[in-house]
C-alpha cells in the first residue's frame, strides 16, 4: 500500500476533527479499527463496515474511560483523548508501551496533560495478573 497501514488508526484519530465525513480502509488487516468503539465512547460518530472506518462530522469528544484495544488503537485513543474535553482515562496502556517507548513522556514534553495513575476501581477495568493496574489519564492536572 502507498500508506503504511499501521498509521491508519492514528490518521483515524485526526479524522475525528474533520469538518466533513471521512473514511479510511485498511486493505491488510480486517480488524485494524478496534479503536472505533473507544471513539464512540468519547462521543464520535464512528462506525466500521468490514475493513472501512467512517467518521461523520459533528461528534463532540468528551473524556471518559476507554480501553486500549491494541498497540495502534491505543495510541489513536490517546490522540483522541487529547482532543476531547475533560479527562480521558485509557486502561491497558501496556499495549501502547510495547510499541511506543516513552510515549507518555514525549507527549508530556510537548505540553500534553497526560499522566500515569492507578486504574479506576469502578468495575469497568478488567482484572489482570499485574499487582497494580495502571492507566493513562489525559486532559487534567492533579
Feature-to-residue mapping (PLM):
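Short, structured segments at the rim of ligand-binding sites
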Residues: 1-142
Amino acid at each position: 500500500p502507498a500508506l503504511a497501514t499501521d498509521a491508519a488508526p492514528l490518521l483515524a484519530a485526526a479524522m475525528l476533527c474533520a469538518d466533513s465525513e471521512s473514511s479510511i480502509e485498511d486493505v491488510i488487516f480486517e480488524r485494524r479499527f478496534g479503536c472505533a468503539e473507544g471513539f464512540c465512547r468519547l462521543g464520535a460518530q464512528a462506525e466500521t463496515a468490514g475493513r472501512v472506518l467512517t467518521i461523520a462530522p459533528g461528534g463532540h469528544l468528551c473524556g471518559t474511560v476507554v480501553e486500549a484495544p491494541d498497540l495502534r488503537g491505543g495510541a489513536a485513543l490517546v490522540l483522541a483523548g487529547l482532543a476531547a474535553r475533560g479527562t480521558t482515562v485509557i486502561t491497558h496502556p501496556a499495549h501502547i508501551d510495547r510499541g511506543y517507548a516513552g510515549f507518555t513522556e514525549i507527549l508530556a514534553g510537548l505540553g500534553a496533560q497526560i499522566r500515569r495513575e492507578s486504574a479506576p476501581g469502578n468495575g469497568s477495568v478488567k482484572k489482570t495478573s499485574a499487582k497494580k493496574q495502571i492507566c493513562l489519564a489525559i486532559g487534567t492536572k492533579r
